[in-house]
């Protein structure tokens, strides 16, 4: 098996943990914070979110409209987020447990890489180790401007899907492995863009009270809820130790 084609299999893990970033690893969503405080505001954002939930507007188009309302230079956006964003209080413990137990963490985000990298480095106090991978959207200049100038940046989507980043694409090659080779695949998320990814994994951790729970209920998709990463850590430890199966966890939550 080539580790180049399947990089998260390089260390032959028994479990791979895929996760959203904003509102999942962070307490609040950094994109929502920027839109509400630096862009057109909470009310308009919620109107567009409702259209996405009702499937009358694609996430890709809605998110681009939201971010386009932010004219603040990109470096100032990052500085603002570094002052205001908080890490889930238990994620750091999960991060080090995963490192010590050969569990790759793969962040699949609809956010932008410079923001995610800056926040992780601040939260952890160092650049993330090799067991943590980030797959997300990028930021590019707008109309030939510098991204650190007024109105100078825009999002560059990871792919052409209506999500802008179809997170399932990253997981499918691992889900397709033969039973004898395939590790347990887990996913944690909170929003609409996590739905495609969740369908490819053995167990979905959906953040309590968020849009992803609503979508799972509507579509009859099995999941278990979490309030913070302490639940995720204890459940993942039990799954890796063979004390419970992902199906058992989802069934108990039903």
Protein language model annotation of sequence segments:
Residues 2, 90-96, 100-104, 111-254:
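C-terminal cap/substrate-recognition subdomain and adjoining C-terminal extension
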Residues 2-138:
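Alpha-helical substrate-recognition element adjacent to the catalytic core
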């Amino acid at each position: 098996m080539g580790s180049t084609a399947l990089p998260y299999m390089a260390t032959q893990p028994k479990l791979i943990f895929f996760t959203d970033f904003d509102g999942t690893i962070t307490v609040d969503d950094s994109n929502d914070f920027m839109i509400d405080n630096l862009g057109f505001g909470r009310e308009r954002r919620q109107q567009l979110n409702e259209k996405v939930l009702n499937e009358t507007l694609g996430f890709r188009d809605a998110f681009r409209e939201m971010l386009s309302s932010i004219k603040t230079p990109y470096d100032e956006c990052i500085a603002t987020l570094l002052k205001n964003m908080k890490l889930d209080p238990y994620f750091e413990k999960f991060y080090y447990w995963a490192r010590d137990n050969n569990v790759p963490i793969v962040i699949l985000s609809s956010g932008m890489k410079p923001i995610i990298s800056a926040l992780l480095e601040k939260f952890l106090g160092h650049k993330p180790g090799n067991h943590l991978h980030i797959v997300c959207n990028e930021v590019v200049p707008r109309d030939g401007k510098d991204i650190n100038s007024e109105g100078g940046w825009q999002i560059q989507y990871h792919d052409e899907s209506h999500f802008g980043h179809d997170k399932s694409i990253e997981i499918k090659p691992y889900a397709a492995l033969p039973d004898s080779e395939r590790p347990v695949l887990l996913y944690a998320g909170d929003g609409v863009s996590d739905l495609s990814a969740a369908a490819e994994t053995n167990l979905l951790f959906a953040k309590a009270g968020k849009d992803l729970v609503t979508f799972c209920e509507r579509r009859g998709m099995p999941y278990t809820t979490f309030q913070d990463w302490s639940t995720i850590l204890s459940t993942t430890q039990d799954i890796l130790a063979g004390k419970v199966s992902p199906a058992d966890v989802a069934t108990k939550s039903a």
